Amino acid sequence: VLFRSNVFGLINKVYEDPNVWMTSGSFKYHDGRPGFAKAPNTDIDVRKQTFTLSHMRTWKSWLWKQIKEEDLRDEKGQYWGVAGDLSFMFPMFEMSGLQNYRHINDVIYTYNESNPLNDHKVNMKKVMETVHKIRSMNSYKKL
């Protein structure tokens, strides 16, 4: 859920800088707790860092198109059933680097963690296995 009415205007303002290829922003949980989203510490080994490229996420379409289709899928050829966001956020950040990425500090999204169908509530073991597999994949080269 968008946190405020001017979220898209704020994001558009960020993209006025032609050097911005992708963003991630800050969120709050539905009960008011602050979320964990923040900019990565460095653009080196982002797959080994605590995952912080969270809601709300945006990117240039051409950047998305650089992701290999097979990296968006599991070993059975199916799109990742859980934790699939890592399969596209890691490659796009690796290709962008810190200089083409912007973290939006303003809270722009409310995350409904009360949903009983959240992946981490339904099958945390599968989430952890998938996270490990995606983190173990080859990194992308910076563009």
Residue ranges and their predicted role:
Residues 1-142:
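Nucleotide-sugar donor-binding/catalytic module of glycosyltransferases
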